[in-house]
Regions:
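Non-catalytic nucleic-acid substrate-recognition regions in nucleic-acid-modifying enzymes
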Residues: 2-137
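Beta-hairpin (beta-strand-turn-beta-strand) motif
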Residues: 99-101, 146, 155-157
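P-loop NTP-binding catalytic core
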Residues: 150-166
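C-terminal edge-of-domain segments
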Residues: 141-152
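Conserved proline-anchored active-site loop of SAM-dependent methyltransferases
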Residues: 38, 42, 143, 174-175
Length: 178
């Protein structure tokens, strides 16, 4: 049996039901619709299919951990407990983005540095290296603090799905002939 991953697909408000339909069509399990996002579970094939087929999602995020954190130590420990060495190579570049709403840890830049520090220490320990050059592939890490609950995500989409286009036009098209 394949590994079951939990994914979150954020979307614009009002498009949740459409996204729910798209996710069901992919064969995802345990679908939960909330304001501005749809959470679901599936294997690696569902992650790939979601990135290729979802039209109303902004991106597909892999949920790595959910835990309570009211102090920077709890934020660090929860992030350090994720097996980052299994997810990221030693030379990975991993920018951190985050948000905080109604939490005791309200300073996003401070939380970003704590999350980055936890990942760096875990990668150095897991890969048994002294430095991390961060000159390899880009892995976007995100965190969300909501009412003292932290969710850590790994972005599987790269550029936002809603910004991707199959046709790139270098010049504007003309509606009338010259």
């Amino acid at each position: 049996m394949s590994t079951l991953y939990t994914m979150v697909a954020p979307c614009f408000f009002g498009t949740e039901s459409t996204l729910n339909f798209e996710v069901k069509r992919l064969g995802a399990q345990n679908i939960q619709v909330t304001d501005g996002r749809v959470a679901f579970q599936g294997g690696a094939d569902v992650i790939a299919a979601a990135n290729l087929n979802l039209r109303t999602a902004e991106r597909v995020l892999l949920l790595l951990a959910t835990y309570k954190a009211t102090t920077f130590d709890e934020l660090f420990d929860g992030c350090y407990n994720i097996a980052w060495e299994d997810l990221l190579p030693a030379n990975a570049a991993f920018p951190i983005k985050g948000s905080s709403l109604s939490s005791q840890l309200s300073s996003v830049p401070a939380c970003q540095s704590i999350v980055k520090k936890a990942i760096v220490k875990r990668l150095m320990h897991g890969h048994k290296v002294g430095t991390l050059p961060e000159d390899g592939a880009l892995y976007k890490v995100r965190f969300a603090l909501r009412k003292d609950t932290v969710e850590i995500y790994l972005d599987t989409s790269g550029d936002g799905l809603h910004k991707l286009s199959l046709i790139h036009i270098s010049e504007p098209t003309r509606r009338t002939p010259i």
